[in-house]
Amino acid sequence: MSQNTTSEHTDVAREPEDLSRLFLCRVNAGDVDGLVALYESDAVLATPDGGEVRGEAGIRAFYAALVASAPRFAPGEQHPALRVGDLALTSTRLPGGAGATAEVARQQPDGTWRWILDRPNVL
């Protein structure tokens, strides 16, 4: 699978729950730019090895390496977002009991949502 780094991202998260669907589509398509667009520029992403990456460059490098291995992600069971003001906690139970995700999203001035904190597997 080749990395798509030039696609346009007309599909945006109008609700915080949209982020999970957009992630799944973009990671399975190998769309690195699309994945980076799901995050604020100073977001923090936890990595499977217990580390973290920060900011657009770090998140881009992480996803470039991930999609290079051509993974296939299946949809999980998404829980309704918990919201307060312009923040939302999103979470998805991963298929097959493989854990769960936890993310914090922030509503942008244009009404769309982007993740600011992402822990892909909390269990």
Please report, for each region that a protein language model flagged, where it lies by residue.
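A beta-strand edge to alpha-helix "cap/lid" segment located at domain peripheries
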Residues: 2-34, 44-123
